[in-house]
Amino acid sequence: LGKALPRARVCGFDISKLAVKAAAGKHKGIPFAVASSFAIPLGTGSVHLLTDVFSPLAQAEFARVVKPGGFFLYAVPGERHLYGLKEILYEAPYENPHRETAYEGFRFVRREQVRDEISLPDGEAAMDLFAMTPYYWKTGVEGVKRLQEAGAFQTEIAFDFLVYERL
């Protein structure tokens, strides 16, 4: 965002200390903080554009910090995001739910979808991807074993970018 909007003041936060440390090291000059989406360390109505990438929706807090006429960009997994991975992990793989687009205090503007496939060359690469997903915390031992033993495979990636304007 800083490169696309050079006059913008950009900051970032994440609940993970490791993620904040990595981001601060990579993006010198941009302030980062360890914080929850449910307690954003910014003033009321101070944000022109808020982005939320694969994090829980903190609707009331987002409405508090985004100024009227400002925007909220919500990146969520599409219905078939990582479906090939789920076919290995689960006996009955499932699609992700289609996200609702109505949030109090915001007007839905549009949905942009990105769809593609990625190749995972072996079980090690698959395990690296798996560790970054919520499936890591809720998959049984048998599913993990199948993934560790997986050869090369492809999986879909599906991202929905939902754009909202603050009322």
Predicted regions and their residues:
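Class I SAM-dependent methyltransferase SAM/SAH-binding core
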Residues: L1-I40
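Short glycine/proline-enriched coil/turn segments at helix->beta-strand junctions
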Residues: P6-R7, H27-P31, S55-L57, P68, ...
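Short, charged, surface-exposed secondary-structure boundary motifs
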Residues: K21-A22, G43-G45, L82-I88
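Hydrophobic beta-strand segment of the Class I
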Residues: H48-T51
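Short glycine-/small-residue-rich Rossmann-like dinucleotide-binding loops
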Residues: F54-S55, P77
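A short glycine-rich, Lys/Arg-flanked "PGG" loop and its adjoining helix->strand segment in the class I
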Residues: L57-L73
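Conserved class I S-adenosyl-L-methionine
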Residues: F71-E104
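Conserved Class I S-adenosyl-L-methionine
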Residues: V114-L167
